[in-house]
Amino acid sequence: MRDWRWMLLVLALLLGWLQYRFWFGPGNSGEVMMLEAQVANQERDNEGLQQRNDALAAEVKDLKEGQSAIEERARSELGMIKPGEKFYRVVEDAPVHPAQPAAGVSAQVGDHPADVP
């Protein structure tokens, strides 16, 4: 009977020690959850960077193999045109704003000379 109590005490102490390490020791559950969140954030960042790399790789391939990408770049970034081609630039008019009264000037009824009878 005495051995049984001794064994129960050892098992309870072992369980207590394991629980302490699980909750407060190195690699505890809070730290594991924090690291899992960091891994998820890093995977999301990596996915975005992979998409950007794929787009850049496709652009490099297009520039190496096709003339249309080079022509498009020359037109849009350098403003180049083909010989004999006419270039038209459409400039939209700036919106007209109504004149605002000067600061400190009050525009009340009766202040204007036309308002006086």
Swiss-Prot record:
Identify its protein family. Answer: Belongs to the FtsB family.
Which residues does the entry place in the Cytoplasmic compartment? 1-6
Name of the protein in its database record: Cell division protein FtsB
- Which organism is this protein's natural source? Stenotrophomonas maltophilia (strain K279a)
List this protein's GO terms for biological process: FtsZ-dependent cytokinesis
Keywords assigned by UniProt? Cell cycle, Cell division, Cell inner membrane, Cell membrane, Coiled coil, Membrane, Transmembrane, Transmembrane helix
* Cellular compartments annotated: Cell inner membrane
InterPro entries (alphabetical): Cell_div_FtsB (IPR023081), FtsL/DivIC (IPR007060)
Which GO CC annotations does the UniProt entry carry? cell division site; cell septum; plasma membrane
